[in-house]
Amino acid sequence: MVSSFTSAPRSGFYYFAQGWKLVSQPGIRRFVILPLLVNILLMGGAFWWLFTQLDVWIPTLMSYVPDWLQWLSYLLWPLAVISVLLVFGYFFSTIANWIAAPFNGLLAEQLEARLTGATPPDTGIFGIMKDVPRIMKREWQKFAWYLPRAIVLLILYFIPGIGQTVAPVLWFLFSAWMLAIQYCDYPFDNHKVPFKEMRIALRTRKITNMQFGALTSLFTMIPLLNLFIMPVAVCGATAMWVDCYRDKHAMWR
């Protein structure tokens, strides 16, 4: 069945909202199950443990606030909580995406076929097994691009004043961009688009992708909703691929 999606690109907020609609479509739900289970088990357990540790971590982070900023502590404390949620949420989201990468790719492929009426290459368990080495190599490429930038931003958290004010904002912007890369990469990789070429393509619509990544990042911090965010974001990113990038980069039609 071909969807009513048009080639006219929309905002990143639109595509994120579409992800929630597309994830429950008949014929797509069975491809959602495995990514959903991985995310529920990992993110659910991780955030349960996080909330048992917040009363230790937040005072430690606030101890880096210099004396001349103590009068702002009532504002910096919420920023410290948000910082921990952002870093922690992105870290475990990355692990979940590594584990579920083959199934996320399959979900993106099947949804694209439904939205466009195109015929994808052979799929199924044997197709997934054949593609696992390529998929994991792609995940390593993303990790290698992400890690040095993340380390620089994490170091900022330990600089008095900057770590409690500027660093959370920079980390949020960085995680928004990285989550856009993470989820948009599944349909790009299904068409064997090189990682560097994919990043160049995303930069041509940077505002749209930042909007999409920002909402994904926010929902990753929200308990319960974050359990469902992985398949939702895959579906939203696939809808964006169909509207904005497929005409130029598709390998199969």
Swiss-Prot record:
Its main location: membrane. It is a multi-pass membrane protein. Keywords: Amino-acid biosynthesis, Cell inner membrane, Cell membrane, Cysteine biosynthesis, Membrane, Sulfate transport, Transmembrane, Transmembrane helix, Transport. GO terms for molecular function: high-affinity sulfate:proton symporter activity. It is found in: Cell inner membrane. InterPro entries: CysZ_sulfate_transptr (IPR050480), Sulfate_CysZ (IPR022985). GO terms for cellular component: plasma membrane. One of its GO terms (biological process) is cysteine biosynthetic process. Pfam families: EI24. The chain crosses the membrane at residues 31-51, 75-95, 151-171, 222-242. Belongs to the CysZ family. High affinity, high specificity proton-dependent sulfate transporter, which mediates sulfate uptake. Provides the sulfur source for the cysteine synthesis pathway. This is Sulfate transporter CysZ. The lineage of its organism: Bacteria, Pseudomonadati, Pseudomonadota, Gammaproteobacteria, Enterobacterales. The gene is cysZ.
